[in-house]
Amino acid sequence: MKKRIPTLLATMIASALYSHQGLAADLASQCMLGVPSYDRPLVKGDTNDLPVTINADNAKGNYPDDAVFTGNVDIMQGNSRLQADEVQLHQKQAEGQPEPVRTVDALGNVHYDDNQVILKGPKGWANLNTKDTNVWEGDYQMVGRQGRGKADLMKQRGENRYTILENGSFTSCLPGSDTWSVVGSEVIHDREEQVAEIWNARFKVGPVPIFYSPYLQLPVGDKRRSGFLIPNAKYTTKNYFEFYLPYYWNIAPNMDATITPHYMHRRGNIMWENEFRYLTQAGEGVMELDYLPSDKVYEDDHPKEGDKHRWLFYWQHSGVMDQVWRFNVDYTKVSDSSYFNDFDSKYGSSTDGYATQKFSVGYAVQNFDATVSTKQFQVFNDQNTSSYSAEPQLDVNYYHNDLGPFDTRIYGQAVHFVNTKDNMPEATRVHLEPTINLPLSNRWGSLNTEAKLMATHYQQTNLDSYNSDPNNKNKLEDSVNRVMPQFKVDGKLIFERDMAMLAPGYTQTLEPRVQYLYVPYRDQSGIYNYDSSLLQSDYNGLFRDRTYGGLDRIASANQVTTGVTTRIYDDAAVERFNVSVGQIYYFTESRTGDDNIKWENDDKTGSLVWAGDTYWRISERWGLRSGVQYDTRLDSVATSSSSLEYRRDQDRLVQLNYRYASPEYIQATLPSYYSTAEQYKNGINQVGAVASWPIADRWSIVGAYYFDTNSSKPADQMLGLQYNSCCYAIRVGYERKLNGWDNDKQHAIYDNAIGFNIELRGLSSNYGLGTQEMLRSNILPYQSSM
C-alpha cells in the first residue's frame, strides 16, 4: 500500500501536492537552471578498492607518514572530489589493521563534491578510508535537485548516507532568494531511511522566525513517515474561520492513519477527523470517524436536544479470500440529518439526500455465486420520512453455458423489507428467475433469443394502517404470488465502409439494432412498492428488459425497440465520431396495475420513448458530447445534456455545459423523500462553464459557474487564483455553493467559502499547477468531454 506523504518537512522543504505536468515541465526546467548536476562518469562499487589521484602545483612529504600539497590541490577517489589551496595528507598504520588510516586536512577555498552534495568552506577534513568529511563555516548545495543552506559545521558520515549540520539552515529557493528557510541547532539527514531529524527547529519567512519546535523527525523522500501534513485554513459563512492541522501516522507497512484537528470558530470547538487505512489478507479498506464534542450553533437551533455530539462514521471495504469469498462494506452514518449541510466531507454531501449502510458477504466459484447482504438508508429529511431496509437479502446465480447451442441461468433472491416507521407495510419477498438464451453471432452481426420465467412470492405484514387510509388507492394483500413469462429477440448488424472519397484512411460503421420484448400484464396493485423506481433511459437504456429497477414493479411489454448507431474511426482506429438514435414503439400499453403511477392511466401506445447520444472528437483539442431523452408518458423532454470542451493541455481548458431534467422525470426516478423536495419542484435547468488557464508567467486562474434558469439564480460558483514558483506556491480560492433549502422562507441556502493556501516547494519533482484538483473538488465537478 503506497502513499506519497507530503509532511511538515514537505511544508518546510518544498514537497508539492499536485501532479499535473502541463506548464509544470517548463517551471521544473527553469528551477533546475540554478541547480548543479553531476557531470562526471558515475563510478560504482567499493570506493576503497579505487585509487586516490592527487594533483597539485607543489608537493612535499615524509613518506609514508605525511605529505603536504599546495596550489590548486585536486584529490579524487571514485565519485568524491576534494579541492583546496592546501591539503595535508596523513597516513598512520593502526595496530592490528591491515590498511593504514589516511586522512586529509584542507585549508583555503575548500570544495568537496560527489554525486549527491557540494560542500564549500574555508576549512575541511576527510577520512579517505571511511569517506567521512567535515567542512567548517560553509555552504552546501544538493546535486541534481533543489536544496541548499549554510552551517557552522557540515559532516558527511556512513559512506555518504548521513549529512549532519550543526547550526545549519535549509531552503529550496534558488540562489539569491531566501523566501523561506529552516534553521536547526543540529540536522541529521538519513538518505537511506529518507528521514531528517531537526533539533531546535525554527521556520523562517525571510529573516523572521514564525515557528519553533524543539524536535522534529520528518520525511524527505517517498517512504511513508509519521509527521504533520500541510496545514490548511479557510473562511466560510457557515463555520467562519476554519483551520486544519493533519498528522500522518505510519502505523505499519499495511496500515496508516491521518488524524486532523479541525478548528471551527463559529462552532466553538475542534472536530477530530480520523481516517484509518488498512490492507490485510481479507481485503483493503478505509475507516473514518469524525467527532465534534459540542456545537454551539446546532445547540442554539435545537435547544431541546441539549449538548449535541455530532459525528460521522464511514467504512468502505473490499476484499477476496481464498479466491472464492468476497467481503464488501459501504457504510456511512451521521449523527443528524443536518450534518452534511454544516460540514464538508469527502464521504457525503447535502445533495445526496441519504446515506447508505450496506454489508455483504459473497461466495463465487465457476458457474455459481451467492451473496448475503443487509442494506439500510439514513434519510436526510426533517419531515420524518420513512425508508426501507433489506434485512437481510440473499442473491444466488447459477450459470450453465454451452448447453448445446443454449446458455442458461437461474437467478434467485430472498429478502426481508423493514421500514423505519412502525405503521408502514413490511414484507418478505422470494423471487426465482430461470433464463434460457440462444446466442448466434459472427463478425458482422448477432441474434440473441431469450426466454425467462419470473416467479415472485410476497408475504406482507403490518397492512392495517395502510389499507385503512382513504388516500391510498391500492389495497394491499397479505400473500401475493406473481408469475410472469418474458420473451425477447435482439438482433444487431454491423456494416462498414471505407471513407476514401471524403477522408482517406477513415472508416465508417452503420449498426442497426432491433429488439422485440413481450411480457404479459399482471396486476401488481396488491404489492407495495419497496424498492422499484423508473430507470433512466439513455440510448443503451432503450434496450433494457425492465422499465423499473427492483422487482416490485415489472411492467407489461409488447414493444419493439429500434435504433441505429454510426461511428467514424480514423486511420489509427481512434473513434472520432458517433451518434445513436432509438425509440420504443408500444403495441399495447405498458402497465403494472399500480394506480399511483399516473401515466398508466393515460392508455398511450405507439412511439412513446426516444433517446439519442452523440460524441464528436472534433480535433485533438475540441470535443462535444450530448444526449437527450423524450418520454411522451411524462409529456416532455425527460433529460438532456450537452458539453463542449476546448482542451489545449492539462492546465488550459474551457468547457461549456447544459443539463436539464424535467420535474416529472425527477419524481418518477428518485425516491419520494428526495424528488419531492422543494428545490426540485421545477426540475433542473442549468447552464454553466468551467475554465482553467495560465494568465501570466507562473500565474493561473480556474473557475466554474453554473446558473439555474428556473430560479434565475446561480447554482454554483468557484474561482481560484494560483501562483507557482520554484520554492513556494500560493492559492486563493472562493466558492459559493448550494447547501440546502429553507422550507419556511422557501429559498435556497448557499454557503460562501474563501480559502488561502501556501505550499513550499523543493525536493519534490512535482511542479504542477493543481488546476484539475480544484475543478474536480467543486460540488458540480469537472468531467472531461474528450
Curated annotation (Swiss-Prot):
Segment forming the signal sequence: 1-24
Oxidoreductase listed as a keyword: no
Transmembrane segments: none
Entry-linked InterPro entries: LipoPS_assembly_LptD, LptD, LptD_C, OstA-like_N
Cystine pairs: 31-726, 173-727
GO biological process terms, semicolon-separated: Gram-negative-bacterium-type cell outer membrane assembly; lipopolysaccharide transport
Gene Ontology terms: cellular component: cell outer membrane; transporter complex
Localization (cell): Cell outer membrane
Sorted UniProt keywords: Cell outer membrane, Disulfide bond, Membrane, Signal
Pfam families, alphabetized: LptD (PF04453), LptD_N (PF03968)
UniProt PTM comment: Contains two intramolecular disulfide bonds.
NCBIfam families recorded: PRK03761.1
Oligomer and partners: Component of the lipopolysaccharide transport and assembly complex. Interacts with LptE and LptA.
Family matches, as PANTHER family: LPS-ASSEMBLY PROTEIN (PTHR30189), LPS-ASSEMBLY PROTEIN LPTD (PTHR30189:SF1)
Family in the record: Belongs to the LptD family.
UniProt function note: Together with LptE, is involved in the assembly of lipopolysaccharide (LPS) at the surface of the outer membrane.
HAMAP family named in the record: LPS_assembly_LptD
Protein name: LPS-assembly protein LptD
Organism whose genome encodes this protein: Salmonella typhimurium (strain LT2 / SGSC1412 / ATCC 700720)
